[in-house]
Amino acid sequence: MGEDLAATNVNRSYALAATSIAIFTFMLFFLYPRFENGRIDPWLFQSTLVAMGVATFSLVFATLHYYRASLAGRISEDERALLTRRGDRFWLLGYTVMFLAPSLVLFTVSLVAVASVWLALWLVYLLFVIRYFPKVQTPRASQ
């Protein structure tokens, strides 16, 4: 993996983690008062916050792995490939869970029809990822 690509992956993951934190804050600001008043499903609200936490920290871990992979001359190519593969997996987990959050929010505020469409699209995305991610992830160093 080239240094430029590793640096790009660091920036991409960092930006998505920051976006995830902003979405988390937005949800707390607008949905927490409804949660306190009992106007939304507490299980769904908390599940959404957990999903955003998993997404955020997965993206942060991806950023750290990509950053370590970008350190030229300090690590071997085998270790760089391993760090990049781990970063790819953390990034995919964070991105996938972050895409689940909108449907959870929509279910939380009782917009069931719209939430169902979002969930169906997320499931299509999940099937697409299961099928194609193994083909596009960073290859092992020995290959």
Task: State where each predicted segment sits.
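Alpha-helical transmembrane segments of integral membrane proteins
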Residues: 39-143
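Cytosolic juxtamembrane helix and N-cap/initiation of the first transmembrane helix
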Residues: 1-16, 43-46
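Alpha-helix boundary/interfacial micro-motifs
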Residues: 10, 35-37, 72
